């Protein structure tokens, strides 16, 4: 029997099984509209997923920052260890998670993942309450594994829940909700970590404040579990797809394809943003000690940066056009270089730091949005998913490199705020490279 016949038989069996369980018919997507029950359920589930991830990561990051109770547990630059623990599962499991999402019902996979999250949330609460840094790090790692599997599930599910004409708007709404959830998670982490650290007695948290991280996590995880239960049943898209246990095979074949044209260069420039983000998010928790402020006030710095990036992205998207798209990239890189350079030299005062972070975050939108648009436009229709998935995997690789850079520079006794100078210098290099590419591109077009 041919593989085609086997696939046909598998698809027929899946269709029969799905009919019995009354899955949502794909052809009814246009009738359902954008704000249907399934999409709203997914939107809320993703919101609480992003919030819970950032609560545990935020509290742990504050706990290992300079002057914090767990500062010495992981050595200098403990924030880099936290960043690596959160990033590695995405690097290793994104492609494998995509295969699971294709061959299984995405709504069913979501419920399984959210059920696992309930158990992990209980483990997280216990480890923070008993003051175990390594236990809390292990909990973060497991949460990252769940999120790595959920990533391809949620983005694949969007196309099954809304009509093609609503897909771009749906993606925008999900991304906006994710950014809001990240900000909420960081703010909650700042509030919780302040009271949790204040309750430390003899190296361990005491009293009711010891359970604050666990309570915050439990609220977000339970709400995410409840919202996922309202997802409609969805049929597997490729039930006969083989499971490739090699997590890197898809990356290798797609990278070879991308290297044949400008896609790989665009993806490299796009992923550089996530390298920068990883370094910056490792630096900022140390500003509690550098500026002499509370964790809550430090979370305001993070929230201000996130809001500014969002505003910059919206502005860049509004001004974007194919003709000027590439020109925005060196402008954004140059703005990042100036902003980070000034942050590395700025005095230890809250207001100037917040202002510089907001300004730098705003210009970041002019760097990332044009590259995202070019990545989508250059990728062929039949390989766009793999191209964007591979680029997403690369972004986490660069994020791990960024966390490693922070860790290495801290071990060399470089003050955290001075690392901004290194990041600014790298952004200057990227600006020069993109300007050179634009010059060559213009010369080639003129010669043609």
State what each model feature region is.
Residues 40-58, 82-101, 105-120, 135-194, ...:
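Substrate-agnostic recognition of the 12-TM MFS/MFS-like secondary transporter fold
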Residues 43, 47-51, 55-64, 75, ...:
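A single, central transmembrane helix in multi-pass transporters
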Residues 59-70, 125-130, 184-217, 290, ...:
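Transmembrane alpha-helix termini and helix-breaking/packing motifs in multi-pass membrane transporters
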Residues 103-117, 318-334, 416:
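Cytoplasmic membrane-interface "Motif A"-like loop-to-helix N-cap segments
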Residues 156, 160, 210, 217-244, ...:
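Helix-loop junctions on the cytosolic side of multi-pass membrane transporters
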């Amino acid at each position: 029997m041919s593989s085609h016949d086997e696939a046909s038989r598998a698809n027929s069996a899946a269709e029969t099984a799905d009919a019995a369980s009354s899955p949502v018919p794909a052809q009814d997507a246009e009738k359902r509209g954008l704000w249907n029950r399934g999409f709203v359920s997914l939107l809320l589930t993703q919101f609480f997923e992003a919030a819970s991830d950032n609560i545990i990561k935020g509290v742990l990051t504050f706990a290992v920052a300079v002057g914090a109770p767990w500062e010495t547990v992981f050595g200098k630059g403990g924030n880099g260890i936290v960043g690596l623990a959160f990033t590695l599962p995405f690097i290793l499991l994104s492609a494998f998670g995509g295969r699971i999402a294709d061959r299984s019902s995405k709504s069913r996979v979501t419920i399984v993942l959210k059920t696992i999250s309930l158990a992990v949330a209980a483990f997280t609460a216990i480890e923070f309450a008993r003051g175990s840094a390594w236990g809390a790090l292990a909990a973060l790692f497991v949460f990252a594994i769940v999120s790595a599997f959920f990533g391809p599930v949620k983005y694949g599910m969007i196309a099954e829940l809304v009509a093609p004409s609503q897909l771009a708007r749906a993606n925008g709404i999900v991304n906006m909700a994710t950014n809001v959830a990240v900000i909420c998670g960081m703010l909650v982490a700042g509030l919780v970590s302040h009271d949790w650290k204040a309750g430390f007695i003899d190296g361990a948290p005491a009293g009711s404040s010891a359970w604050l991280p666990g309570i915050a996590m439990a609220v977000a995880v339970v709400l995410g579990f409840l919202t996922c239960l309202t997802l409609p049943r969805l049929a597997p898209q490729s039930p006969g797809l083989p499971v490739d246990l090699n997590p890197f095979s898809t990356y290798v074949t797609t990278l070879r394809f991308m290297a044949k044209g400008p896609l790989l260069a665009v993806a490299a420039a796009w992923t550089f943003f996530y390298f920068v983000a990883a370094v910056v998010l490792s630096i900022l928790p140390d500003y509690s000690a550098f500026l002499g402020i509370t964790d809550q006030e430090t979370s305001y710095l993070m929230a201000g940066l996130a809001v500014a990036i969002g505003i910059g992205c919206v502005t860049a998207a509004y001004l974007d056009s194919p003709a000027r798209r590439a020109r925005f990239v060196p402008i954004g890189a140059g703005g990042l270089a100036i902003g980070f350079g000034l942050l590395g030299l700025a005095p230890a005062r809250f207001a100037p730091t917040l202002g510089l972070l907001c300004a730098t975050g705003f210009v970041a939108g002019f760097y990332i949005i044009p590259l995202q648009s070019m990545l989508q436009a250059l990728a062929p229709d039949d390989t766009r998913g793999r191209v964007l998935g591979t680029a997403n995997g690369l972004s986490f690789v660069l994020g791990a490199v960024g966390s490693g850079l922070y860790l290495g520079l801290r071990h060399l006794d470089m003050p955290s705020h001075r690392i901004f100078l290194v990041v600014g210098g790298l952004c200057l290099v990227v600006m020069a490279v993109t300007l050179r590419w634009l010059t060559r591109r213009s010369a080639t077009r003129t010669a043609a």
